[in-house]
Amino acid sequence: MQAFLVILFMVVVGAVIGGVTNVIAIRMLFHPFKPYYIFKMRIPFTPGLIPKRREEIATKIGQVIEEHLITESVILQKLNEPNTREAINDLVIKQLSKLKSDDATIRKFANQFDFDLDLDDLINNKLDKTIINKLNNYYYDKQATSINEILPADVITMVDEKLDQAGDLIRERARNYLSSDKGARDIYDMLDTFFAEKGKIVGLLQMFMTKESIAERVQHELIRLTRHPKAKVIIDKVIRDEYETLKSQPLSHVVKEEQFTNISESLVHLVITNLQLNEKMDTPISKLTPKLVDQIQVGVANTITDLIIKQASNHLSTIMTKINLRQMVENQINTFDLDYIERLIIEIANKELKLIMSLGFILGGIIGFFQGIVAIFV
């Protein structure tokens, strides 16, 4: 009986120790939230693991999401899936179906989008000839006038103000290009071509420096050159001189008469093509062309859907760069309260954490059992 009590006691003690140890270990993942000090010395294991490593965790989660979960290829694949295409197409059709409303007319659409045009006057007075004549007369009157005198003063002022930023923008873009991997490769390729053309003379230089080191040196000096004050002065002066030269040129030198005529005719033709007769301006579209809406929904809707997907795919890389998904995830996680993070992890891994605690009790009890047996025989 005594031996049984000893074993039972050791099992209970071992189970309590094992279980409590695992409970404390799990608690130490989250707590304490801040470090504690005794005599200016930080107490070990404060703060807890997750509070201490929260920024690293946020960085890694953001990296995993950007590089493995929500990647450009994944989004491209999703965009081109039949379900996505169908959803976009349904939305486009839904918007186009509004044309079926009884009061939807061309004039109302024009007014809705603030087209400040007297459609009746334009149609009745032969818009094409009127506009072409006015444009041609304007060109003949202004062909000897400089661009500086033709453009409005506020436009000239705006361009003058923005012009000072052009040099800085050019130098910045040049710096970005030279600092990029492509810039480095291009410099190396040009040096490689240069060495191949110069032959043995340049070969002597390679006895002291490798092509890679020469390319790095050239890259460094070019980048440094873009930051040199004199480079800024030269670039700004060239831009300013070219701009002043352009402003002083007469209109006929900048745009030739034949070019102006072609542009005018194309523009007027485009305007006329998109206008209708007066009686059709106030006729509901559903009555004007009963089959038009259905044709639009079938043909144009598919075209618009393809265009949306194509444009989204072509600009996806730029969009992803602008969004900066990794940084967005990091910032969001870092704004979470530690209490919320603790609740979130516990909700996700509640079952597993309970199993870990139970395993601690079980292993502790097993160890206590064997310790009890050893204690009896010893």
From Swiss-Prot:
InterPro entries: DUF445, UCP032178. The keyword RNA-binding does not apply. It comes from the Bacteria. It is a multi-pass membrane protein. It is found in: Cell membrane. GO terms for cellular component: plasma membrane. PANTHER family: UPF0754 MEMBRANE PROTEIN YHEB. Belongs to the UPF0754 family. This is UPF0754 membrane protein SH1116. It comes from Staphylococcus haemolyticus (strain JCSC1435). The lineage of its organism: Bacteria, Bacillati, Bacillota, Bacilli, Bacillales.
